[in-house]
């Protein structure tokens, strides 16, 4: 896992190395303070060979040099270190999120059907951010603290070997304590992160569906459901906190014993005349420079434990396999005719589930309009979703112009199929930018022309800023009919040879339906058009109507032919016209 993460770090290794070098200088400067104290005590105050004026003179020079170093030299070094560290870590996170976003766009509809959006977002935002601590702590600060400890110990050995050995007495206990606590802490951190992601996933769904909550007046019930998720997170967070508190209490106890031992041994040596008072004072100063980094290392282990847990979750997402892949030798094939052949196609969402579609055979000619009807759950929309490869067939094949759709590059295939759904998604951007999703390189004139053909131009011009009006999240500032017309404008802009209308007008009022149906009639002209419809009055003009029940095609024909047959279609049509 760490090795994989380091692949993201590798391009910035020289910046990290530079950050460590600058950090060594930054952390090395405070090590002058204990030596200054020793000089002030032994070299000036207790130096009976100097007069009072000479003592003041020597002390003034020493303090002046120290002030110059700490006031003039150290601040820019600190700035450079902080800037380098933050720039590097943020750039690495940028690269990880970029890879994750591209990966998410390549994952199929199956992945999104099986995972909460909130949990996915939590991994891209929260977990990636948490891995930043691995960069700052694991790749930078830990090394700086270790180097600080080595330098401090070197100076302490130089000052007095016995005192240094006394300070090192507690090190084995320190290592044992870290070993005992932090394996358990990593597991608890992973559980806490998962619980937090569940809270975020629940919250994301309920905020998006707040209108449903309010319409059924179930705020109290949803508050209870949220409290269950929140309580689960609290329980795991407190368990993590308790174990973390145990570890810090144990570690701090061990590191607090060290200075007490050193002061006791040092005072005895000073009384016996083995060391000077200045040496003891300097040694006590270096104790903080020794045990301070040790305590930070303990905190670093906690931080890294959390970072590793998040890293696990990030790579779990990166390792999600693409179940929709470009086949070997796939090409950006141009669809010239738009003929579709569905050949013995069966489909099931998961291996342990019953098939949704069973041995479907159907040929659709160039420019033909074919409607799929039937009871809900029969497999109409599922069949439609197989054509742009939102899912892959379980068995059989789908051909377009004689080419298996798996021979197309996925992007090339989908770009040549226009899809208008019942609930079209608009992004939180302007009207113009939402239309441009159909073809991002289109000119303003082409955008306006597409809007006119979709019967959208007039209402757009009545908006406060026209085409520059912000539509809000998911197009919340627009009506259902207005959103649908913008989605149709996208298709006009893209001008694909194949058109799929999946319940495109079923949720609209009669006036909006009439306006949109007019635009759809223009849009479907001279294109192979597939329509999924519950409202049968909207598809009586179709060249072919296909009735699907329980995953099988049970009837095929024109409206007139199927009415005359008095079968499944005639039954559905009669019910709707009672």
Curated annotation (Swiss-Prot):
Segments on the Extracellular face: 37-59, 160-162, 264-269
Domain ABC transporter: 340-575
Cellular component GO terms, alphabetical: plasma membrane
Positions contributing to ATP binding: 374-381
This protein's UniProt keywords: ATP-binding, Cell membrane, Membrane, Nucleotide-binding, Translocase, Transmembrane, Transmembrane helix, Transport
Span of domain ABC transmembrane type-1: 16-306
Subcellular location field: Cell membrane
A Pfam family recorded for this sequence: ABC_membrane
Record-annotated membrane-spanning stretches: 16-36, 60-80, 139-159, 163-183, 245-263, 270-287
Regulation of protein activity: ATPase activity is inhibited by orthovanadate and activated by the cancer drugs doxorubicin and vinblastine.
GO molecular function: ABC-type oligopeptide transporter activity; ATP binding; ATP hydrolysis activity
Ranges per topology, Cytoplasmic: 1-15, 81-138, 184-244, 288-578
Coiled coil: none
UniProt cross-references to PROSITE patterns, sorted A to Z: ABC_TM1F (PS50929), ABC_TRANSPORTER_1 (PS00211), ABC_TRANSPORTER_2 (PS50893)
Enzyme class: translocase
EC number from the UniProt entry: 7.6.2.-
Known role: May be involved in multidrug export. Transmembrane domains (TMD) form a pore in the cell membrane and the ATP-binding domain (NBD) is responsible for energy generation.
Record's subunit section: Homodimer.
Domain writeup: The ATP-binding domain (NBD) and the transmembrane domain (TMD) are fused.
Protein name in the entry: Putative multidrug export ATP-binding/permease protein SAV1866
């Amino acid at each position: 896992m760490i090795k994989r993460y380091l692949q993201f770090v590798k391009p910035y290794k020289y910046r990290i190395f530079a950050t460590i070098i600058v950090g060594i200088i930054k952390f090395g400067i405070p090590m002058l303070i204990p030596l200054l104290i020793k000089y002030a005590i032994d070299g000036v105050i207790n130096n009976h060979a100097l007069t009072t004026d000479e003592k003041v003179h020597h002390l003034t020079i020493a303090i002046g040099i120290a002030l110059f170093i700490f006031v003039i030299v150290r601040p820019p070094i600190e700035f450079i270190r902080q800037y380098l560290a933050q720039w590097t870590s943020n750039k690495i996170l940028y690269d990880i999120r970029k890879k994750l976003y591209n990966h998410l766009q390549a994952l199929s509809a199956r992945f999104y059907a099986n995972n909460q959006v909130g949990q996915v977002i939590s991994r891209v935002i929260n977990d990636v951010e948490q891995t930043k601590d691995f960069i700052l702590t694991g790749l930078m600060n830990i090394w700086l603290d270790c180097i600080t400890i080595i330098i401090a110990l070197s100076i302490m050995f130089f000052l007095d070997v016995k005192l240094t050995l006394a300070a090192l007495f507690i090190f084995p206990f320190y290592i044992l304590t870290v070993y005992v606590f932090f394996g358990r802490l990593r597991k608890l951190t992973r559980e806490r992160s998962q619980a937090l992601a569940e809270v975020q996933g629940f919250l994301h769904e309920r905020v998006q569906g707040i209108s449903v909550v309010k319409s059924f007046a179930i705020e109290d019930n949803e508050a209870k459901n949220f409290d269950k998720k929140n309580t689960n997170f609290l329980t795991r967070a407190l368990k993590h906190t308790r174990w973390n508190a145990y570890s810090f209490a144990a570690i701090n106890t061990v590191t607090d014993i060290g200075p007490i031992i050193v002061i006791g041994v040092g005072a005895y040596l000073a009384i016996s005349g083995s060391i000077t008072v200045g040496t003891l004072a300097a040694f006590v100063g270096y104790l903080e420079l020794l045990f301070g980094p040790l305590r930070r290392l303990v905190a670093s282990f906690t931080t890294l434990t959390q970072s590793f847990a998040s890293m696990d979750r990030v790579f779990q997402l990166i390792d999600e396999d693409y179940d929709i892949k470009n086949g070997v030798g796939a090409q950006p094939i141009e669809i010239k005719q738009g003929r579709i052949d569905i050949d013995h196609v069966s489909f099931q969402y998961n291996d342990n589930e019953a098939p949704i579609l069973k041995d479907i055979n159907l040929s659709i000619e160039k420019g033909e309009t074919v409607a799929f009807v039937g009871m809900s759950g029969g497999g109409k929309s599922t069949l439609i979703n197989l054509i742009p490869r939102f899912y892959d067939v379980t068995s059989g094949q789908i051909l377009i112009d004689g080419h298996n759709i798996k021979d197309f590059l996925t992007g090339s295939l989908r770009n040549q199929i226009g899809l208008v759904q019942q609930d079209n998604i608009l992004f939180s951007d302007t009207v113009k930018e939402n239309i441009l999703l159909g073809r991002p390189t289109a000119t303003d004139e082409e955008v306006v022309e597409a809007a006119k053909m979709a019967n959208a131009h007039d209402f757009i011009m009545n908006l406060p800023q026209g085409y520059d009006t912000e539509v809000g999240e998911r197009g919340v500032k627009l009506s259902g009919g207005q959103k649908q017309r913008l989605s149709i404008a996208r298709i006009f802009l893209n001008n694909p040879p194949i058109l799929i209308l999946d319940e495109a007008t079923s949720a609209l009022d009669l006036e909006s339906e009439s306006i949109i149906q007019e635009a759809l009639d223009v849009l479907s002209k001279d294109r192979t058009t597939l329509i999924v419809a519950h409202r049968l009055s909207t598809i009586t003009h179709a060249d072919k109507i296909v009735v699907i029940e329980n995953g099988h095609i049970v009837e095929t024909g024109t409206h007139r032919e199927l009415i005359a047959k008095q079968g499944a279609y005639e039954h559905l049509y009669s019910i709707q016209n009672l």
